[in-house]
Amino acid sequence: MRVIRQLHTSKRLLQSLVDKQKYQATTYARPNHLVLTRGKNAILYDDVNNKEYIDFTAGIAVTALGHANPEVAEIMYKQSKKLIHSSNLYYNEECLKLSENLVEATKSFGGQYDASRVFLCNSGTEANEAALKFAKRYGILKSPSKQGIIAFQNSFHGRTMGALSVTSNPKYREPFGSLIPGVEFLNINDELTKLDQQVSSLKEKTAGLIVEPIQGEGGVFPIPLDTLVGLKKICEDHDIIVIYDEIQCGLGRSGKLWAHSYLPKEAHPDIFTTAKALGNGFPIAATVTNDKVNDILKVGDHGTTYGGNPLGSAVGNYVVNVIAEQKFLDEVNKKGEIITNRLRKLQERFPEHIKDIRGKGLMIGCDFDEAPAKIVDAARDSGLLIITAGKTTVRFVPALTIEDNLLEKGLNIFEKAVEKVYS
């Protein structure tokens, strides 16, 4: 009798929650039957339906240190009792510490060798907006005609107007009509000689170039190192600011602190952006620049109300301190190899359907011959949450702290989902 009562109670609660959708903007598609109530590292719980899920999404590569991380929770609790927000009219200790931490950790772990300044904000799209503004400011000071931005096909940089303007997918762009002018999209897969010709033809009107070292939303495509090295040289020749968008691929996700840490220093950016993992779920982001960029900025050129608040900065400091350890990064690579090895064995069984396995660290794409929606649904029905990227790719971006046994268990579910769809 108790089980029946609980079932009826759960159904009523679920229906009540679903009914409340009418109060939300219709901008998201969600499975109506799934209501997440709590989490623990790489597990999410739906207490309404009495279900639990292994989470290979990490809130879209956000909760790098796991859901409900106890240390993060403790830091938030202690800091919230001291000071949550004070604005950028005044200094606060945590903001200053995080800025120093980001710069020094970046240099120590093979990232931007001349990193020097940090602008703190709240989200990835905001960090990219700042980067675009800084690049345009630099260009305009060189020549009033140098205002344009070069971006790449298959890119995703955010949904606010500036970031959307350098995002190539028509699905995101077309509903909003005219965007910021002066954006040119190139094909990142073109030969360097062709890219050189294209950039050279745009040099008089281009302030900056923005690229993801690993394209995330576009399908998990690591950009060849030679391409990034070549692009930086081309841009330096034409005094064009180079921006690396590390919103998704940064902070340990690639197996190094930054995805551009794989590059020699001559290919390091003038600006790079980070968000997602930086707050482990708390909204905080950063735009990191060198002095070449910072020297052209003046008080009032940009700003934010909440950026660099003490609470978010305290969390960010903890996250950077944990991830910026070689032992931690080695573990990320080890877990990534577990996924890659399992997927390659699965590919051997289904070569006509699994076309490619690609990625770095714990940012891995499994590319199919068709949209993998049925696989995502089958996995979810069996207790695994996974997401897609691009049109035909399943994206694996679990918490960087996921336990090996849970990783293997989740991969077992994924294999069975593929078997169910294709056997």
Swiss-Prot record:
Q: What is its EC number?
A: 2.6.1.11
N6-(pyridoxal phosphate)lysine-modified residues are where? 276
Question: Domain of life of the organism in this record?
Answer: Eukaryota
Top EC class, one word: transferase
Q: Which PROSITE patterns does this one have? A: AA_TRANSFER_CLASS_3
What is the required cofactor set for this protein?
Answer: pyridoxal 5'-phosphate
InterPro entries on file? AcOrn/SuccOrn_fam (IPR004636), Aminotrans_3 (IPR005814), Aminotrans_3_PPA_site (IPR049704), Class-III_PLP-dep_AT (IPR050103), PyrdxlP-dep_Trfase (IPR015424), PyrdxlP-dep_Trfase_major (IPR015421), PyrdxlP-dep_Trfase_small (IPR015422)
Q: Which SUPFAM superfamilies match?
A: PLP-dependent transferases
Compartments where found: Mitochondrion matrix
Gene Ontology MF: a single term? N2-acetyl-L-ornithine:2-oxoglutarate 5-aminotransferase activity
CDD domains with a match to the protein in the record: OAT_like
Pathway connected to this protein: Amino-acid biosynthesis; L-arginine biosynthesis; N(2)-acetyl-L-ornithine from L-glutamate: step 4/4
Q: What is its main location?
A: mitochondrion
Q: Name one GO biological process term.
A: L-arginine biosynthetic process
Q: Which UniProt keywords apply?
A: Amino-acid biosynthesis, Aminotransferase, Arginine biosynthesis, Mitochondrion, Pyridoxal phosphate, Transferase, Transit peptide
User: What is the disulfide pattern of this chain?
Assistant: none
Gene Ontology CC annotation, any one:
mitochondrial matrix
List the catalytic activities from the record. N(2)-acetyl-L-ornithine + 2-oxoglutarate = N-acetyl-L-glutamate 5-semialdehyde + L-glutamate
Per its UniProt record, what NCBIfam families does this chain match? argD, PRK01278.1
Similarity field: Belongs to the class-III pyridoxal-phosphate-dependent aminotransferase family.
- Would you tell me the protein name for this molecule? Acetylornithine aminotransferase, mitochondrial
Q: Which gene encodes it?
A: ARG8
